[in-house]
């Protein structure tokens, strides 16, 4: 019998579209994982639309759901995956749950996308309350095993600015020293060796060699920029990175190549479809730019490698 691998995913939920748990659950299931989803919010659609309605789960309600799992003794997990959170007490409760689950299963891997803000034209801006930063820095990152910040979030967590690839590697080492063995800076403002049409991402993974010493693999990836604003890409990235690092635990290069290549196929299919719907010369709407997830099932399951990672 095939070994079951179960993920507890605590993220947002939308009725229409693909962000948060809606962007993470399908690819993880396609790749063979059982996914138990806790919806931190339930909205009609993502907040990039003109209107949205819905409810927000608070920390007491999260505790209640977790207590229900505990009472039935079904709170055994191999992975925890978290993304966007707006509330400090909710985030602290997530940390408590992760710590309890790790006591039960010391091999549990916590994958955290520390969603706090982004960089536009060199200027960084937070889109969560400022009081979340110390919680991420002091409580969340120390219990995380894999983190997927963008450049701005990596700078926030370490208090260091990144202007060069060398500085990015130093920041990733600082993040390692805070706890996680795998760090992927999912996007950066750094100029790619391939030119300004490319977006650069960087990764670093520490593994223990048979002799007990720590070995670090560092990689760089360059992805062709797409001129559109997608929502849910970070959630999809973190979910697929979880899956591919599980399948290639000591090879970040291969895990990232599969993750980024699958992302490429999903985004290309999405932009092609959005442009066909919007018509020539018309900017696609948020609804038209929803990720073409179901249509990309084969690419998620078995991505043709179109992005090669460079080992640094």
Swiss-Prot record:
<protein>
    <recommendedName>
        <fullName>Pyridoxal kinase</fullName>
        <ecNumber>2.7.1.35</ecNumber>
    </recommendedName>
</protein>
<comment type="similarity">
    <text>Belongs to the pyridoxine kinase family.</text>
</comment>
<keyword id="KW-0479">Metal-binding</keyword>
<feature type="binding site">
    <location>
        <position position="47"/>
    </location>
    <ligand>
        <name>pyridoxal 5'-phosphate</name>
    </ligand>
</feature>
<keyword id="KW-0963">Cytoplasm</keyword>
<feature type="binding site">
    <location>
        <position position="118"/>
    </location>
    <ligand>
        <name>Mg(2+)</name>
    </ligand>
</feature>
<keyword id="KW-0007">Acetylation</keyword>
<feature type="binding site">
    <location>
        <position position="233"/>
    </location>
    <ligand>
        <name>ATP</name>
    </ligand>
</feature>
<dbReference type="GO" id="GO:0008478">
    <property type="term" value="F:pyridoxal kinase activity"/>
</dbReference>
<feature type="binding site">
    <location>
        <position position="113"/>
    </location>
    <ligand>
        <name>ATP</name>
    </ligand>
</feature>
<keyword id="KW-0597">Phosphoprotein</keyword>
<keyword id="KW-0460">Magnesium</keyword>
<dbReference type="InterPro" id="IPR004625">
    <property type="entry name" value="PyrdxlKinase"/>
</dbReference>
<dbReference type="GO" id="GO:0009443">
    <property type="term" value="P:pyridoxal 5'-phosphate salvage"/>
</dbReference>
<feature type="modified residue" description="Phosphoserine">
    <location>
        <position position="285"/>
    </location>
</feature>
<feature type="binding site">
    <location>
        <begin position="186"/>
        <end position="187"/>
    </location>
    <ligand>
        <name>ATP</name>
    </ligand>
</feature>
<feature type="binding site">
    <location>
        <position position="113"/>
    </location>
    <ligand>
        <name>Na(+)</name>
    </ligand>
</feature>
<keyword id="KW-0547">Nucleotide-binding</keyword>
<keyword id="KW-0418">Kinase</keyword>
<feature type="binding site">
    <location>
        <position position="148"/>
    </location>
    <ligand>
        <name>Na(+)</name>
    </ligand>
</feature>
<feature type="binding site">
    <location>
        <begin position="150"/>
        <end position="153"/>
    </location>
    <ligand>
        <name>ATP</name>
    </ligand>
</feature>
<feature type="binding site">
    <location>
        <begin position="234"/>
        <end position="235"/>
    </location>
    <ligand>
        <name>pyridoxal 5'-phosphate</name>
    </ligand>
</feature>
<feature type="modified residue" description="Phosphoserine">
    <location>
        <position position="59"/>
    </location>
</feature>
<comment type="subunit">
    <text>Homodimer.</text>
</comment>
<keyword id="KW-0862">Zinc</keyword>
<keyword id="KW-0808">Transferase</keyword>
<dbReference type="GO" id="GO:0005524">
    <property type="term" value="F:ATP binding"/>
</dbReference>
<dbReference type="InterPro" id="IPR029056">
    <property type="entry name" value="Ribokinase-like"/>
</dbReference>
<feature type="modified residue" description="N-acetylmethionine">
    <location>
        <position position="1"/>
    </location>
</feature>
<feature type="binding site">
    <location>
        <position position="12"/>
    </location>
    <ligand>
        <name>pyridoxal</name>
    </ligand>
</feature>
<dbReference type="GO" id="GO:0046872">
    <property type="term" value="F:metal ion binding"/>
</dbReference>
<feature type="active site" description="Proton acceptor">
    <location>
        <position position="235"/>
    </location>
</feature>
<dbReference type="InterPro" id="IPR013749">
    <property type="entry name" value="PM/HMP-P_kinase-1"/>
</dbReference>
<feature type="binding site">
    <location>
        <begin position="226"/>
        <end position="228"/>
    </location>
    <ligand>
        <name>ATP</name>
    </ligand>
</feature>
<comment type="function">
    <text>Catalyzes the phosphorylation of the dietary vitamin B6 vitamers pyridoxal (PL), pyridoxine (PN) and pyridoxamine (PM) to form pyridoxal 5'-phosphate (PLP), pyridoxine 5'-phosphate (PNP) and pyridoxamine 5'-phosphate (PMP), respectively. PLP is the active form of vitamin B6, and acts as a cofactor for over 140 different enzymatic reactions.</text>
</comment>
<comment type="pathway">
    <text>Cofactor metabolism; pyridoxal 5'-phosphate salvage; pyridoxal 5'-phosphate from pyridoxal: step 1/1.</text>
</comment>
<keyword id="KW-0067">ATP-binding</keyword>
<feature type="modified residue" description="Phosphoserine">
    <location>
        <position position="213"/>
    </location>
</feature>
<dbReference type="GO" id="GO:0005829">
    <property type="term" value="C:cytosol"/>
</dbReference>
<feature type="binding site">
    <location>
        <position position="186"/>
    </location>
    <ligand>
        <name>Na(+)</name>
    </ligand>
</feature>
<keyword id="KW-0915">Sodium</keyword>
<feature type="binding site">
    <location>
        <position position="47"/>
    </location>
    <ligand>
        <name>pyridoxal</name>
    </ligand>
</feature>
């Amino acid at each position: 019998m095939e070994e079951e691998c179960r993920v507890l995913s605590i993220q947002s939920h939308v009725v229409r579209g693909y962000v948060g748990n809606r962007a993470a659950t399908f690819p993880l299931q396609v790749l063979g994982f059982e996914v138990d989803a806790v919806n931190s919010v339930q909205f009609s659609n993502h907040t990039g639309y003109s209107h949205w309605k819905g409810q927000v789960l608070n920390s007491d309600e999260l505790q209640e759901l977790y207590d229900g799992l505990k009472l039935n003794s079904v709170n055994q997990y191999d992975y925890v995956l978290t993304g966007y959170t707006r509330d400090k007490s909710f985030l602290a409760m997530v940390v408590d749950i992760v710590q309890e689950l790790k006591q039960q299963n010391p091999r549990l891997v916590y994958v955290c996308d520390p969603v706090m803000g982004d960089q536009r034209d060199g200027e960084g801006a937070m889109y969560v309350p400022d009081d979340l930063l110390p919680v991420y820095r002091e409580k969340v990152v120390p219990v995380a095993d894999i983190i997927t910040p963008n450049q701005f979030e990596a700078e926030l967590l370490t208090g260091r600015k990144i202007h060069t690839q060398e500085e990015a590697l130093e920041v990733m080492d600082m993040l390692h020293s805070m706890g996680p063995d795998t760090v992927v800076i999912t996007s950066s403002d750094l100029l790619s060796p391939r030119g300004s049409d490319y977006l650069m991402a960087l990764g670093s993974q520490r593994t223990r060699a048979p002799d007990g010493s720590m070995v670090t693999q560092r990689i760089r990836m360059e992805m062709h920029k797409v001129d559109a604003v997608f929502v849910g890409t970070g959630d999809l990235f973190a979910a697929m990175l979880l899956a591919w690092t599980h399948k290639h635990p000591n090879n970040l290069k291969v895990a990232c190549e599969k993750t980024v290549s699958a992302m490429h196929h999903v985004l290309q299919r999405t932009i092609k479809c959005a442009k066909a719907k919007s018509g020539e010369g018309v900017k696609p709407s948020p609804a038209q730019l929803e990720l073409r997830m179901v249509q990309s099932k084969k690419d998620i399951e078995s991505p043709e490698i179109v992005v090669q990672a460079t080992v640094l």
